[in-house]
Amino acid sequence: TTVRASVGNYLVSKFIAENSNCKVIFNGDGADEVCCGYVYLKNAPNPEALQKESEKLVKEIYYFDVLRSDRSISSNGLEARTPFLDKAFVKYYLSIPAELKIFDGINRLEKYLLRKAFDSHGLLPNEALWRRKCAFSDGVSSQNKSWHHIIQKFVDQKISDDEFIRERKIFNHCMPQLKESYYYRKIFEQLFGNNEQLIPHFWMPKWVKTQDPSARELTGYQE
């Protein structure tokens, strides 16, 4: 989803750069990792597993989404600030008992404690504060025609089934499981050579049965 989300990230940054005098902007990176906001986390088998996954996401964020935002935003001449990754905030939130971070997505929304902290100040309208999470990488597109489906249709025209089955095996580290990831990997290898070890693993949501990291592919996801 990092590559998918980079497109929306880049276009929003481009619009800001072309239509305002802003040079430094805030973004929401880190909130899902620190505050347990990803939809799949509601399937954590116990509070301990939820806490462990949150800490892992925070530890590895510089490999994925933060790097994506930095490149997408700075390429448009802007500087990003990530308040949810403030060291004091991260340290404090990770110290909160995991039992208080559990959510079901219905009676208790993801990032409940973060939402509740702003509930009595009037800083945010309720329709923004209490709306359901909308996955960014697919949230740039309609539910009838998701962004990841658009990309996959494009890739199908570029990569044949035979090529995918035959050539993906040359990548021993993080072997591509989908044509889309194989397409990205080919571009990466052309630009950066054999440096795939820089990424420790291919990110996928835990505790769910899916081959695609898109939140819209998860059972129970609603926007």
Where are these regions (language model features)?
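ATP-dependent adenylation/nucleotidyltransferase module used to activate substrates
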Residues: T2-E33
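Soluble or luminal CAZymes and related metallo-dependent hydrolases
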Residues: R4-G8, L109-E110, E180
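Active-site phosphate/pyrophosphate- and oxyanion-stabilizing loops and adjacent acidic/basic residues
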Residues: Y10, K14, K116, K186
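Proline-centered flexible-loop/turn and helix-kink motifs
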Residues: E18-N21, A98, G193-N194
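Mid-to-C-terminal catalytic subdomains of enzymes
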Residues: C22-K52, E60-Q177, I199, W203
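Internal alpha/beta domain cores that form substrate/cofactor-binding pockets in large enzymes
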Residues: L57
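Acidic, carboxylate-rich catalytic segments that either coordinate divalent cations
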Residues: Q157-E223
